[in-house]
Amino acid sequence: MYSDLQQPGSFSRKIVRYLRNNKTHSLHKPVRKHFKRRRIITHYPGQIIQMDLIDLQKFSGSNSGNRWILVVLDSFSKKLWMRALKRKEGVETADAIRSIFHDMDYPVQSVIFDEGKEFLNSSVNMLFAQFNIHSYHIRTKIKAGAVERVNKTIKNIIWKLFTETGKHRWIDSLNDIQDNYNNTYHRTIKMTPNQVTRENRKKVFKNMFPEIDDRINCRLQKGDNVRVALNKETFDKSYKVNWSEDIFTIEKVFQRLNVCWYRLKDQSGNIYPKGKYFYQLNKV
């Protein structure tokens, strides 16, 4: 490895090859957690909506017993609907979602949410079946990003309201907050959420995804052998093994919107349908 010190490029490439082939280094290599992931691609209002809850339990005494805000976001138009909840039980959550569906100007095709019991219950499932809606719940630690960002925006507005009024009452302002959000210019769609319709959806799509046809060079290729990052809890020791003992082979490479992801197969030829990103793989 050290025989060609006059050629720095050659020297660095040899180090990379050595480290890739060194099992100890390969297993303990740090895992990068924050990186660019695939975006949700939608083509019209109602195609995909996201749901989440804002936890305001500690202010329930000032808000007539209301403890939560149900947040529903249309991924295409960025339009927002909110409902106050006293309990996050199945029946109350389903009733709130139903009232939002009735307020919408278009049918909903798919819903995305996390694994909270407020959404994973028979009452909500029956509601989705009634409206012929496909539902998907997120099993990873990466939540539905768009609605998470909206939650932060809404909480920021509510906390400013607390400061301005000197009180912790938000329930009376919920509709005004919703209307203000939906009439505010959104830089992604280059208009307000209330201005988005099915008639101008092509313009909105072009504003959202101008780079949809761009091509990039993916850093891993079909046939490369890799280890897979282990799912570790927040407080797991960083010096423990970070990568799988088993070695997988990249079976297919995908890319869209300047993001690459990879489908893997194990040494027995079994294909794993769920894709992995570059930073979740460690080439060996």
What are these regions (language model features)?
Residues 162-176:
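Short, charged, surface-exposed loops that flank catalytic or proteolytic processing sites
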Residues 1-6:
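DNA-recognition alpha helix
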Residues 8-156, 187-284:
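Retroviral integrase
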Residues 153, 157, 176-180:
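Generic recognition of well-ordered alpha-helical segments
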